[in-house]
Structure formats: structure tokens, C-alpha cells
UniProtKB/Swiss-Prot annotation:
Protein name in UniProt: tRNA N6-adenosine threonylcarbamoyltransferase
EC number: 2.3.1.234
Protein purpose: Required for the formation of a threonylcarbamoyl group on adenosine at position 37 (t(6)A37) in tRNAs that read codons beginning with adenine. Is involved in the transfer of the threonylcarbamoyl moiety of threonylcarbamoyl-AMP (TC-AMP) to the N6 group of A37, together with TsaE and TsaB. TsaD likely plays a direct catalytic role in this reaction.
Organism the protein comes from: Rickettsia massiliae (strain Mtu5)
Chain positions recorded as Fe cation binding sites: H112, H116, D308
Protein family (similarity comment): Belongs to the KAE1 / TsaD family.
Cofactor binding summary note: Binds 1 Fe(2+) ion per subunit.
Enzyme class: transferase
Superkingdom of this protein's organism: Bacteria
């Protein structure tokens, strides 16, 4: 049986997973660093890298035990090798390459974004091609996923990522870290029509997005309010989340038009939303409705596979393993690595 070991360390979560050739997840362990970064209100790169050093060995042992697997049973080792916090990426990549060398097993360098892009093929086994909205704390882009290693970016944020906007607004409201889930929770208690926020470049006619002006508008509102209580916080959260939904819905329509122009694909109408923001249930509902209007089906992974995890890295490794796309051990990890720059 083919077993793929996946290692993910692009930011502040240490993750290790083992999956089989049949897309069965035998074990998927994530060691969170939230408690280490909460006091700073965000991720501290040096702390993240040092924590990966202390967590990786433990995570690997737990995954092997939980999956009843020996290291010698592993067919190949796949590890995130960019993009991300370079210190964190190096730690995970070096750990994986050391295992590869010691075990004499192939190594596969995985682009973290490709891991997110292919998650829907792990969970739903959807065919190529499909339209992807990758929405996380570090990225926000529409991508035509044409095949393994074949990606066309249709549009992206010109400033902040949508996940970053969620986290920054949560910090303005003194909510806990990470901020995205806190905004979503508070939004269920608030009035989404209480405050009107701008929707930057929503009528640009292309797939690019902007969230910096929205974030600034929220900050300005908070500074001008005389009192900030729970009701106000809930209303701001709801109004902010509603505006994000409006922006993404509009841009999904632009992305569908751009996607259909380059694919001529009218029988496999799938839109995938991946990344941490894909876990937001409100956005799932809004974008599902938008997709349905155009005859598309919106697919999103289970919540535990929306955020950073190693199962998606292992699966991307499986697709590359099946195509004999291995990586030399002298591969240099990358802080920046576009999906369009992936080489097969």
C-alpha cells in the first residue's frame, strides 16, 4: 500500500499527516501555537520557527502511532517548501529532507497554495478543471485549476488578504486571536445593516480585490464611536462580514466569466473555496447561492481541512508521486512562490 507522509509548517501550525493511495486519511495531527502568539496579537515568525523545531518530532511520532505505520512503510515524504514564513518553511522542509535521506525515500516539495488548491480532490474527488477561490490570512486569489501544476491566476487582492482583514478587524475590536472565528461568532449576534462600509474596486470589471480600504473604514468608525460595547462590537462584526460577502459574491461573478473564457468548460461547473476563510459558514452560504445562480456548485472542505493542515500536503504529494514528480534534496525553500511558477 502506498502511504504518503505530509509535513506542513508554513506559518504557526505544526502539522503531520499520513494518507493512502485511496485518499484515506490515516492520521492528521495539528499542534497549534495559538497560546504562544496570543499575547502578541499575531504570529511572531521567530517564535513560530522555534516551536516547529520542538513540535515536529512529537507530531511525527503521534501520527505513526495513530496510523499504525512504521517509518519504513512510508512511500514518499511531501513537505511544504513555500510560500510562507521562511524560517518556519525551512524547519519543516529540512526535517522532511532529512527523513528522506535517512530512509532513502523520495522527497516532494509542495507549494502550500497547491495543497489548498487540491484539497477538494482529496475530499470530493472532483475532476479538473475547476475554479478556485483561495482565501486565507496570507492570500486571496481566483485561480483556474486546469490540471496538476497547471494554474492560471485570474485575479488577486491588490493589498491585504481577506483573512488578514478579518484578523486585523478582530484586533481592533479587542477580540481573541485568531480573529476570523471570533468575527464570525460575533456577527451572528449583530445587525449586518447597522453600518455601511465601502466595497473597494467592486465595479472594476476584473477579478482583482481590495480589502485595505474596508479595514481602514472600520478603524475610522471605531475611533469616532463614543462607546464600544458588546452590541456595537456585534454590529460592526456583522456589518464587516456582510460587506466581505458582498465583495466576494461580486468578484465570483467576474471570475466565472474569466474562467469560462479560458476553459470553454460548461459541463463541469465546480467552484472550490479553500483556505482558512473557507471555514466561515456565512460566506459558504452566500457564495453557494451566488454560484448556484450561474449553474455552478460550490465545494468547500470540512472545517478541519480548510485551515492549514498536512493532509492536503500529503494529498498534493500523492498526485505528484503518481506522476513521478519528485524533488531533489537540494531544493531551496521559498518565502514567495506563485502557483503559476510551479514546475512539473
Amino acid at each position: 500500500m502506498i502511504k504518503i507522509l505530509g509535513i506542513e509548517s508554513s506559518c504557526d501550525d505544526t502539522a503531520v499527516s499520513i494518507i493512502t493511495e485511496n485518499r484515506e486519511i490515516l492520521s492528521n495531527i495539528i499542534i497549534s501555537q495559538n497560546t504562544e502568539h496570543t499575547v502578541f496579537g499575531g504570529v511572531v515568525p521567530e517564535i513560530a520557527a522555534r516551536s516547529h523545531l520542538s513540535h515536529l518530532d512529537k507530531a511525527l511520532k503521534n501520527v505513526l502511532k495513530e496510523s499504525n505505520t512504521k517509518l519504513t512503510d512510508i512511500s514518499t515524504i511531501a513537505a511544504t517548501s513555500g510560500p510562507g514564513l521562511i524560517g518556519s518553511v525551512i524547519v519543516g522542509s529540512m526535517f522532511a529532507r532529512s527523513l528522506s535521506s535517512a530512509l532513502k525515500k523520495p522527497f516532494i516539495a509542495i507549494n502550500h497554495l497547491e495543497g489548498h488548491a487540491l484539497t477538494a480532490r482529496l475530499t470530493d474527488n472532483i475532476p479538473y478543471p475547476y475554479l478556485l477561490l483561495l482565501a486565507s490570512g496570507g492570500h486571496c486569489q481566483f485561480v483556474a485549476v486546469l490540471g496538476l501544476g497547471k494554474y492560471k491566476i485570474l485575479g488577486s487582492t491588490i493589498d491585504d488578504a481577506v483573512g488578514e482583514a478579518f484578523d486585523k478587524v478582530a484586533k481592533m475590536l479587542n477580540l481573541a486571536f485568531p480573529g476570523g472565528p471570533e468575527i464570525e461568532k460575533r456577527a451572528t449576534l449583530g445587525d449586518p445593516n447597522k453600518y455601511k462600509f465601502p466595497k473597494p474596486i467592486i465595479n472594476s470589471g476584473n477579478c482583482n480585490m481590495s480589502f485595505s480600504g474596508l479595514k481602514t473604514a472600520v478603524r475610522t468608525l471605531i475611533m469616532n464611536l463614543k462607546e464600544i460595547n458588546d452590541t456595537v462590537i456585534n454590529d460592526i462584526a456583522a456589518s464587516f462580514q456582510f460587506t466581505i460577502g458582498e465583495i466576494l459574491s461580486s468578484k465570483v461573478q467576474d471570475a466565472i466569466r474569466a474562467y469560462e473564457q479560458i476553459t470553454n468548460n460548461f459541463d463541469k461547473k465546480n467552484i472550490v473555496i479553500a483556505g482558512g476563510v473557507a471555514a466561515n459558514k456565512y460566506l459558504q452560504e452566500i457564495l453557494s447561492s451566488c454560484a448556484k445562480t450561474y449553474g455552478y456548485r460550490l465545494i468547500y472542505p470540512p472545517i478541519h481541512l480548510c485551515t492549514d493542515n498536512a493532509a492536503m500536503i500529503a494529498y498534493a504529494g500523492l498526485e505528484r508521486y503518481n506522476n513521478k514528480l519528485f524533488t531533489p534534496l537540494n531544493f531551496c525553500p521559498k518565502a514567495r512562490w506563485s502557483l503559476e511558477d510551479i514546475s512539473n
